[in-house]
């Protein structure tokens, strides 16, 4: 059977909050079967636990933000993307600030952290959400859609009129039946424009942003000395974000995701639209491994995992 997964041992790291610029300590702990992924603000007078759920996402202007009882945990999408890519179902995430550390701006540090803790299967069936009919949300020319598909694949189109982005691919598709998340997606860094960073800093945000944790572009070129990690790193990062945004639904999705210029807000609207239509999805488990989509098979786990 396809089993749930958690990590074998506690693991901890320290990083910088993208917006606060402050030091953040992140601790990942094993969680029992059927726990899900639970974020806890351990710095508050009374710790607040926030289980991931589509309905728990509040602010989505700059990142995906979990909210509960006035407590917030921001910028969860890169860690959630790593959890999805490695097939982690159950995890306690303790953080002593209101945002997850940005690390290098990709999911690679979180993949390394989870792998260094060790990943173990649990004696419980992994539950999937299978998309049964197409669900779509739009905002102007922005679009996000989920379609029935026996596996997990994504296609994303961006539209940034910028010389450095134009030289790379603006559309990227990936099917995890035959492609590795760790190799092809995890290392893609977040990116932004210098004038936007300055505007955010004037608002007291992006204080931790730097060339060490983002690709930064001026009007004509990339300011980083380091070359792109992928020829089309910009759109691959949007795929990375989408994987993390979708995983807050609480289970891996069996389906196809298609997006044009989507972002955290539209991705969350898509999940809510899916869950609002009981005919659009079903919960499934697989007693026999060979009945499951190839993307989620144990031998493929170094692939989508």
Swiss-Prot record:
Catalyzed chemical reaction(s): a UDP-3-O-[(3R)-3-hydroxyacyl]-N-acetyl-alpha-D-glucosamine + H2O = a UDP-3-O-[(3R)-3-hydroxyacyl]-alpha-D-glucosamine + acetate
Pfam families, alphabetized: LpxC (PF03331)
The protein's Enzyme Commission number: 3.5.1.108
MF-aspect GO terms: metal ion binding; UDP-3-O-acyl-N-acetylglucosamine deacetylase activity
The UniProt record lists the keyword Phosphoprotein: no
Pathway, per record: Glycolipid biosynthesis; lipid IV(A) biosynthesis; lipid IV(A) from (3R)-3-hydroxytetradecanoyl-[acyl-carrier-protein] and UDP-N-acetyl-alpha-D-glucosamine: step 2/6
Gene Ontology CC terms, in alphabetical order: membrane
Chain residues that bind Zn(2+): 78, 237, 241
Statement: the UniProt record of this protein carries the keyword Mitochondrion: no
GO biological process: lipid A biosynthetic process
Cited function: Catalyzes the hydrolysis of UDP-3-O-myristoyl-N-acetylglucosamine to form UDP-3-O-myristoylglucosamine and acetate, the committed step in lipid A biosynthesis.
HAMAP family: LpxC (MF_00388)
NCBIfam families: lpxC
Name recorded for this polypeptide: UDP-3-O-acyl-N-acetylglucosamine deacetylase
Species this protein is from: Cupriavidus necator (strain ATCC 17699 / DSM 428 / KCTC 22496 / NCIMB 10442 / H16 / Stanier 337)
């Amino acid at each position: 059977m396809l089993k749930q997964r958690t990590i074998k041992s506690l693991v901890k790291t320290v990083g910088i909050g993208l917006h606060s610029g402050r030091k953040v300590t992140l601790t990942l702990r094993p969680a029992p079967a059927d726990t899900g992924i639970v974020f806890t603000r351990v710095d508050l007078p009374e710790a607040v636990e926030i289980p991931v759920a589509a309905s728990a996402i509040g602010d989505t202007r700059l990142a995906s933000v979990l909210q509960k009882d006035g407590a917030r945990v921001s910028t969860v999408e890169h860690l959630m993307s790593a959890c999805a890519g490695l097939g982690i179902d159950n995890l306690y995430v303790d953080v002593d600030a209101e945002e997850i550390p940005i690390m290098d701006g990709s999911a690679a540090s979180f993949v390394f952290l989870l792998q260094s803790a060790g990943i173990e299967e649990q004696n419980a069936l992994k539950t999937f959400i299978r998309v049964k009919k197409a669900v779509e949300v739009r905002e102007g020319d922005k679009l996000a859609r989920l379609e029935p598909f026996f596996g997990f694949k994504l296609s994303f189109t961006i539209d940034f009129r910028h010389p450095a982005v134009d030289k790379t691919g603006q559309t990227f598709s990936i099917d995890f039946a035959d492609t590795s998340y760790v190799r092809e997606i995890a290392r893609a860094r977040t990116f932004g424009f210098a004038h936007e960073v300055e505007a955010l800093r004037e608002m007291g945000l992006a204080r931790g942003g730097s060339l060490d944790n983002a690709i930064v572009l001026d009007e004509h070129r990339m300011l980083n000395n380091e070359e792109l990690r992928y020829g089309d790193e910009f759109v691959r990062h949007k795929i990375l974000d989408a994987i993390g945004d979708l995983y807050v639904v609480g289970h891996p999705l069996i389906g196809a995701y298609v997006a044009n210029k989507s972002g955290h807000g539209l991705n969350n609207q898509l999940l809510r639209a899916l869950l609002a239509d009981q005919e659009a999805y079903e919960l499934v488990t697989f007693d026999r491994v060979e009945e499951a989509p190839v993307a989620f098979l144990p031998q493929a786990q170094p692939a989508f995992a």
